[in-house]
Regions:
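Flexible, glycine-rich active-site loops centered on histidine and acidic residues
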Residues: 10-46
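A polyampholytic, Gly/Pro-enriched intrinsically disordered region
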Residues: 8-19, 82-87, 177-178
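Condensing-enzyme catalytic core mediating Claisen C-C bond formation in acyl metabolism
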Residues: 35-106, 110, 114
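Claisen-condensing/thiolase-fold acyl-transfer catalytic domains that form or cleave C-C bonds
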Residues: 1-12, 109, 113, 120, ...
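Beta-strand segments within the central parallel beta-sheet cores of soluble alpha/beta enzyme folds
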Residues: 16-24, 61-63, 128-134, 155-160
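Acidic-glycine-rich active-site phosphate/pyrophosphate-binding loop
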Residues: 21-27, 82-89, 142-154
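Short, well-ordered secondary-structure micro-motifs
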Residues: 31-32, 73-75, 145-146
């Protein structure tokens, strides 16, 4: 999403006509395979999309990027990309992606619903105007809850998270390719 926002700004400036955006993550290097609450949720992936200026009212109409660094404890990687071991040589049980799922779910649903409404308002559109929503593929339950909050239902939402898991920066390019 952040990459799309940056590319959108470059294209609107008129200095660029065509830009390749690549999103790739190897989350399998960051999961603790002994932690079944997180390791099954994430996947590796890469995707790319070429965006270009075109006349008319098609394409990316608006972007809104928000973040809240104070919520970092809801989802973070405690020790980086390398496994850590205790003094006995055992794998550190706190290694890898750490997530507070129920809390993260509530925050994500509220934030994605609100930012989607803001983006639509910025363009003078309503949720009913959405023909197809391609959200970040974080979690099926989050995507379903956001679709419900927007009143669009899943028939207007593209979803592939059940096949690939959360591929982080690659999720939207992969979904757009499909």
């Amino acid at each position: 999403v952040y990459g799309l926002s940056v590319v959108h700004s470059y294209l609107k400036s008129g200095d660029y006509n065509r830009i390749l955006l690549v999103g790739a993550d190897a989350l399998s290097t960051m999961v603790n395979w002994k932690d079944r609450t997180t390791c099954v949720l994430f996947g590796d992936g890469a995707g790319a999309i070429v965006l270009e200026n075109q006349s008319g009212d098609r394409g990316l109409l608006s972007t809104i990027v928000e973040s809240n660094g104070s919520l970092w404890k809801l989802l973070h990687v405690r020790t980086g990309h390398r496994q850590t071991f205790d003094q006995k040589g055992e794998q550190d049980s706190d290694w890898g992606i750490q997530m507070k799922g129920p809390e993260l779910f509530k925050v994500a649903v509220r934030a994605l619903s609100n930012v989607t409404k803001k983006a639509l308002e910025k363009c003078g559109l309503a949720p009913d105007d959405i023909q197809l929503m391609v959200p970040h593929q974080a979690n099926l339950r989050i995507i379903q809850a956001v679709a419900d909050r927007l009143g669009s239902g899943m028939d207007k939402v593209y979803c592939n998270v059940q096949r690939f898991g959360n591929t982080s920066a690659a999720s939207i390019p992969i979904a757009l390719d499909e």
